[in-house]
Amino acid sequence: MSAAVVTVRGLRRAFGAQQVLDALDLDIADGEFVAMLGLSGSGKSTLLRILAGLDHQADGSVVVPRSRAVVFQNPRLLPWRRALANVTFALADAGPDAPSRTARGRAALDEVGLADKADAWPLSLSGGEAQRVSLARALVREPDLLLLDEPFGALDALTRLKMYRLLHDLWARRHMAVLHVTHDVDEAILLADRVVVLSDGRVSLDRRVDLPFPRSRGDEGFDDLRRVLLAELGVREEVGHDRGR
């Protein structure tokens, strides 16, 4: 196992009387892809915001790499900037001169398959294209840790499948650590090295996904792991239920 790039110990975060994270411990190794599941209100997004440095009100110990980036469900593109300018905006505080920023931005757009959309306005992009620009904006920072907060939740099914393949290829090529927050059990199994479930502000289940890539629903071991994860989430799948395979 590689050295940990994320180490969380005894993390607590409350909002008023509501304890959202309660003495949570978590490690993520260098280059590891971890998917995080949990019911609404379980603390997934709160944890991600803390790791991203967007929430400084928690107690406990958090060690994260300096170079990290976040992709949210909403692409959050600036509508008055073209796609390339949205990507290079992430480098505004990084120090490189303008030509270098432009070259890195174009390379990031090319990496997500949008080299021809550099001059496009955000409102002219499809939902999938806008999310790929958002992903390029994260990648251009060359993060050691990529934090994903349900980035595919607003996309249609076919676009989600394309984004799964893109994300897996980027992760395999860049060898960065990934924490992927999702409500979709199948998505977690398809993408991750490891799946953790949050419940009552703590990790209630931590399971490695020992299935070879590429994965698909119906693979040997897929359904068994799916049932384990659903049970941990309090969902019992009905016998004979057809998921459209």
UniProtKB/Swiss-Prot annotation:
State the reactions this protein catalyses. Answer: ATP + H2O + aliphatic sulfonate-[sulfonate-binding protein]Side 1 = ADP + phosphate + aliphatic sulfonateSide 2 + [sulfonate-binding protein]Side 1
Entry GO MF terms: ATP binding; ATP hydrolysis activity
State the gene name recorded for this protein: ssuB
Alphabetical list of InterPro entries matching this protein: AAA+_ATPase, ABC_transporter-like_ATP-bd, ABC_transporter-like_CS, ABC_transporter_ATP-bind, P-loop_NTPase
This protein's UniProt keywords: ATP-binding, Cell membrane, Membrane, Nucleotide-binding, Translocase, Transport
What's the family? Belongs to the ABC transporter superfamily. Aliphatic sulfonates importer (TC 3.A.1.17.2) family.
Q: What is its EC number?
A: 7.6.2.14
User: Where found, per UniProt?
Assistant: Cell membrane
Q: Which Pfam family, giving just one, matches this sequence?
A: ABC_tran
Q: How does it sit in the membrane?
A: Peripheral membrane protein
Where does the record place the ABC transporter domain? 6-225
The species this protein belongs to is Mycobacterium sp. (strain MCS)
Subunit and interaction comment = The complex is composed of two ATP-binding proteins (SsuB), two transmembrane proteins (SsuC) and a solute-binding protein (SsuA).
Organism phylogeny? Bacteria, Bacillati, Actinomycetota, Actinomycetes, Mycobacteriales
Q: Which domain of life is it from?
A: Bacteria
Q: What does this protein do?
A: Part of the ABC transporter complex SsuABC involved in aliphatic sulfonates import. Responsible for energy coupling to the transport system.
Q: Which residues bind ATP?
A: G38, L39, S40, G41, S42, G43, K44, S45
Q: Which GO terms describe its cellular component?
A: plasma membrane
Q: What is this protein called?
A: Aliphatic sulfonates import ATP-binding protein SsuB
Tell me if Nucleotide-binding is a UniProt keyword of this record: yes
EC top class named in words = translocase
Keyword Isomerase recorded: no
